[in-house]
Regions:
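Periplasmic c-type cytochrome electron-transfer domains
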Residues: 1-356
Length: 356
């Protein structure tokens, strides 16, 4: 309850490596160890005084201590989006939201250019103009810039990768700057806070009724059926892209049981397909595939591990031996030789496949 900030929701500590300045206001870009608007490591280290002022330490954390903490914390990433389809496709509603988000219709905003750089003046934006999605730059909703929203302070444009985690605060009162109706009491709640910096909004579709998004002839949500587009954009934002593809972490075991094989077979096909599919992630080094597929089994009493070589279309054992897809699946025909397939983060397949 800072006298200037007021109450604000706690932001996730995951996935911060490429998002620039931290805090809702981006204010940690200027602090204890220096000033830089785009340096996530420095911004993280500038939290050092909080260990004294908020947590009761006798003094701020040392720079060495904060550097070690930053080295660890900035490697922690957001999990794959649990709403996005496992083949990374969009539903019809999500695709409509995607098309509006990246479309030509301005939704809100005037870009204030740097002094002396008027060539970059843009009078209006689509959603992506402020909430930039660019996997090659590691941006998933934040362009690292600040915005003036007509509230008591200037805030940084936040990322949008964890909107699904904010669902659960149901209902809200009507407010003067939006057209969403007063919902009345909605019963038991899952979360105490919802969307935006202070957690006061229950649904993204309700947030999209604020004045800056109001439908006009050439800006805001469409004049015809705006609520449908609001819901579509909400659906897309709940399925937002991230550094890890949706298939990462998926696992299936193939056994000799006929019914189980019938269910597992198409899932294995999917995992192999996604392990071949190109994917872009700055965090993972740029151009990769959606996952590294590994398989583990017990063959003739010995534990075996394999990683999928997408170029050769074969499974490579930790001992260097190779198996075709069909040959590996056939091992599971024998009870006790079940084969477990796992889509692991790109770059980790060989390590995870290795049997110690």
């Amino acid at each position: 309850f800072h006298p200037m900030k007021g109450p604000m929701t706690t932001q996730t500590l995951k996935g911060m490596a490429n998002s620039g300045a931290m805090h809702w206001r981006g204010d940690r870009s200027n602090g204890f160890f220096g000033v830089h608007a785009d340096d996530a490591v420095l911004s993280f280290k500038n939290f050092a005084p909080a260990f004294e002022g908020l947590l009761g330490n006798p003094e701020p954390m040392s720079e060495g201590g904060m550097q070690a903490f930053a080295d660890f914390m900035l490697q922690v990433q957001l999990q794959p989006n649990p709403i996005r389809n496992l083949d990374n496709s969009l539903t019809a509603a999500q695709k409509r939201g995607f098309d509006f988000y990246f479309g030509e219709r301005p939704s809100d905003g005037i870009l204030v250019p740097e002094i002396g750089n008027l060539r970059n003046f843009v009078k209006s934006h689509n959603c992506n103009g402020c909430h930039t999605v660019d996997a090659a730059q590691g941006l998933y909703g934040t362009g690292k810039m600040q915005s003036f929203e007509g509230i008591s302070q200037i805030v940084k444009v936040p990322h949008l990768r964890n909107m699904y985690a904010k669902v659960g605060r149901f209902g809200g009162a009507a407010v003067p700057f939006a057209t969403a109706p007063d919902t009345g009491h909605q019963g038991d709640q899952v979360r105490g806070f919802g969307f935006v910096h202070d957690g006061t909004v229950d649904l993204l579709a309700h947030f999209f009724t604020v004045r800056v998004f109001q439908p006009t002839l050439n800006s805001g949500f469409p004049l015809i059926n705006p609520n449908q587009t609001r819901r579509d954009v909400s659906d897309f934002m709940h399925a937002m892209d991230s550094d890890l593809a949706p298939v990462v972490g998926q696992q299936v075991t193939l056994s000799a049981d006929a019914g189980q094989r019938l269910a597992a077979w198409p899932r294995i096909d999917l995992l192999i397909q996604r392990a071949k599919t190109p994917f872009v992630s700055k965090l993972l080094g740029g151009q990769v595939t959606e996952c590294d597929l590994v398989a583990h089994t017990v063959e003739n009493g010995l534990r075996r591990g394999f990683w999928f070589d997408a170029v050769a279309n074969a499974f490579v054992g930790s001992d260097g031996s190779r198996r075709t897809d069909a040959a590996l699946r056939s091992l599971a025909n024998v009870a006790g030789q079940e084969v477990t397939y796992t889509c692991t983060p790109p770059g980790s397949g060989r390590r995870i496949a290795a049997v110690q």
